[in-house]
Regions:
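A hydrophobic/aromatic-rich effector-binding and dimerization subdomain
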Residues: 4-7, 85-133
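Short beta-strand His + acidic residue motifs that chelate non-heme Fe in jelly-roll/DSBH
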Residues: 58-60, 76, 82-90
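Conserved metal-binding segment of the jelly-roll/cupin
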Residues: 68-82, 99-100
Length: 133
């Protein structure tokens, strides 16, 4: 059975990567400011944007594998599972992560708009690719 990190609030992930809590509803991390940490397969109860120059190959997202090429953004939403199972290896990453609790947008116009953003959907298997302008 796979070990799954249950991210019930943004600071669960912060604690996992040895970062201090920022706010009860929001976590913003710059990976270059963190030490070594382990990979994780995550069950999200939060929204998130993972922004990296290069993602590791084989990131699972639901029953699929995410396709990333170069600088990309991966979006996650509550109820979704994704990541790379912990194999015991300590790693570093380059980039940013923003996680926020659904409570932050509950009852707001932004909550309604987010429902229409396809990149938070399980049906998406491609990252949002960033290209220089």
């Amino acid at each position: 059975m796979k070990k799954v990190l249950r991210i019930t609030n943004p600071n669960v992930y912060a604690a996992y990567v040895n970062a201090p809590p920022l706010h009860p509803l929001v976590c913003i991390l710059r990976y270059e400011e963190l030490g070594l940490f382990r990979r994780s397969l995550n069950l999200y109860s939060v929204y998130g944007l993972f922004i990296q120059d290069e993602f590791v190959k084989g990131i699972s997202y639901g029953m699929k594998t995410y396709e990333t090429h170069g600088p990309s953004i991966i979006a996650v939403a509550p109820g979704q599972i994704g990541g790379v199972e912990d194999n015991g290896e300590l790693i570093t990453r380059k980039g940013w992560v923003l996680l926020w609790s659904p409570e932050l947008t509950q009852g707001t116009a932004w909550e309604k708009k987010m429902e229409g953003y396809g990149f938070f959907s399980y049906y998406s298997s491609n990252s949002l690719e960033m290209t220089p302008t």
